[in-house]
Each structure stands twice: as C-alpha cells, then as structure tokens.
Amino acid sequence: MMNDRRDFMIASLMAFAAPALRVEGRIEGQQPTANASRPVATKDAPKVNLDGWQMTATEITIPPGAPPGRKHRHPGFVIGYVLEGQYSFAVNDQAPQVINAGQMFFESFDAPGEVHSASGNASATQPVKFLAIVFTKKGDPVTIPG
C-alpha cells in the first residue's frame, strides 16, 4: 500500500499517462531500439493527505475554432498533459497560458477550487487533445460550474 502521496501521484500518472503516450509500430526492416525517456515537468506535490481521494483520467479533444469552455472549477487538483495541438487556459481571470503538445500543466495545486476562467483550443486550424488527471475526494464531482 502506498502511503506516501508523492509515490501515489507518480504511480497514478504513470498508470494513466503512459499508455496514452506510447507510439506503436515501426518501419519495416527497422530494428527495435531501446526505450528513451525524458523528464517533461517537475513540480512539488500539493500538501494534502490523499486517503479517501480518487483520480479520474479524461482525454479531452477540442476542435479548431471551438468557443472557449465555460468557467468551471475542480474541488481537487489537476495534472494535465497535452498530447497534440495547443491548449489555452486561464485561472482566476489571469492572462491565458498556452501549453503545447508534449508539455504538462498543473491546475489548482496551490488553491483547490480556483476558477478556470478560460479553457480552450489555442489554434483556429488544428484540434487540441490533452489528458487531464483530476484528483478529488471520493464522492466529490470532478468539475463544478464556475
């Protein structure tokens, strides 16, 4: 049993994100190569005891030119990874941040329940796809209208 929250978060992220990030197949005649890894992001874990918490992993795709999502918040915190495209989001009416494919983002780490005032696709021509892993207390909703 994992009691350390950091070990739990790392194991959780690996369990949900790793399958989404793998690339399958190879060119005919190509020899298999050793797996490569690279750090994507490092951030201190939130100071919470995760006993009685759950996580929900959701893959979200937003088409190009789609209107921004409605204001919302999460009662816990979010670890996100952009799989393709460019994701734009803002918290508490701050200037939007653009997160590119291959980058991670963190929401509500310092203050669970922050209002996400903007959330959408930063591109008018390409879709954005990202993985959001939301940690909440068991029984709490994943998302609450803003």
Task: Please place each PLM-identified region on the residue numbering.
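N-terminal secretory signal peptides and thylakoid transit peptides that target proteins
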Residues: 1-19
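A short glycine-rich, His/Asp/Glu-containing loop-to-beta-strand
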Residues: 35-71, 133
